Amino acid sequence: VEQHDDDSRWRLCWARQPSRPYTARSDVLADFPDLAAREAALGIRPGQPFLLMADGRPDIEVLEFFRSAAFQSLAAGSQESYAPDIQLFLSFLSVQGIDWRAATFEHLADYEFWRRRDQHNPDRVGAATFSRDLAAIRKFYDWQQWRGNVAVSPVVLHQPSASGDSDSRRLQPSAVRSVQLKWLTPRAYRRWRDVGLGGYRGDGMRDTTWRGRNDGRNLAFAEALWSSGLRLREGGTLVLGEIPNADSQVRYAKARVGQAVAKGRGRDFWISAAALKSIDNYVISTRAAAVHRARSEGRYDALTDIKVVDTVDHHRRVHFTNREGTKGTVPLDSLAWRDRLNFYITTDRGLEPWMVWLSEAGLPLPYRTWEAIFSAANDRCQNLGVDIHCHPHMLRHSFALRMLVTLIYAHERKMGITPAERREYRHIFGDPWVLVQTLLGHVNVETTRDCYLEPVSGLQVDLFLNDDVAEDTSIADFITHIAAAAPGIVDTEEQ
């Protein structure tokens, strides 16, 4: 099956953000000044995704799914990924003239072949991505079947195969972990950062043609993820009140990430003093300039649905006042990323967004924007002959590997303690895996092991057997030493 043409694809849309200035682009919409109230009455949440047919007409049964409890109870990240997954499957059916209500297991099997193995599809995906596709399609059809809109879901066929499994089970990839994680060594990260985000050339010299207006912001964000291991959504939605003060007496400062942006589980995190200094420099320079421009152009005055923070109490409850002067409170932990876009603070110079990361226009930067920024940095590296690729989550992986190697190295060689003292240390603080689990916020230590066991497999044995690694070797050098034997670790340009 060939790629879908644009005129046959279902359209992925999002409900309006009330905090953003909005001008009706249609005379029809202009006739409904109470549109926001109508949407709220129907349970349509600001920024929520939904689908329209290729010609722009609504399919009520599809729209009902997107405002159902089954969909809206999903984590924000799952909603954002499930919507385009469902869009793609419905488009796959539409281009063949198949109504989604008539989809069968055979159609789903065709889709699996096209998505993963069809040589005519230039955008084939791996096991992990298709597993997510299947989860989204199952969620959609389970709800439609429950509502009586389809008789049988194409994802669930209770007809056992010769092996005893249902047919649909055969579509579930058995090797989801076959997708290779990648990590950057410290020197590879610095090279990617300097060239991709910082305006250097491949030869290490400054690029005189570089016009990076936001390099202060972008460098500070990369340093924040690199030094803290925060997920993209966690780091990309931080508000000013969540950034700890840089303390010259400590190398890492502790802070807390909110529950609603941390996969439903708030947690402590640690961030380096160097990263905090980069953020401070961004706040007083590039960010301050963007805020000044926005104020001068009256951009904040045009916002109608913002909440101005009065204070955050010791219970982490945010006290705020809205545009109408009505006061309210909300737990900081319950603020999802879209909620955070609407919160502002007042300084002696006027209003400004509460979120740390802003666009050039002085408005909060939706965290997914960072994916495009990293992609542009990768393109710049590629064009300048630096064959290092990085995405935001790769910085989290790299942080975890760096911490794990550091802890194992400290336990086995550098602490200078007896075996009995080492056992006592582990009894009090836990082994390196548990400590890294804490740093990453994983619920289960097995998740940590599943992700990071391969690159450090045999590391403890290697530390005892290979005395050629000097005692004064730095952790960065040591990671470079083991990178040679771990194909997933990117140290210099990939060959």
Walk through the language-model features, giving the residues of each.
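Short functional hotspots where side chains directly engage DNA or cofactors
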Residues: V250-G258, H391, M415-V456, D462-N466
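Conserved tyrosine-mediated DNA breakage-rejoining catalytic core shared by Y-recombinases
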Residues: T237-T346
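C-terminal secondary-structure termini that scaffold catalytic or DNA-interacting sites
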Residues: R9, L459-Q495
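Short, basic (Lys/Arg/His-rich) helix/loop patches that form interaction surfaces
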Residues: E371-T438
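Basic, Lys/Arg- and aromatic-enriched nucleic-acid-binding interface segment
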Residues: D194-L232, H427-G430
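N-terminal core-binding DNA-recognition domain of tyrosine recombinases/integrases
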Residues: V62-S78, I86-S174, T208-T209
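Long, amphipathic, Lys/Arg-enriched alpha-helical "connector/arm" segment
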Residues: D167-N214, K263, A274-N281, S285
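Short, charged phosphate-coordinating catalytic segments
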Residues: G148-V150, L225-Q249
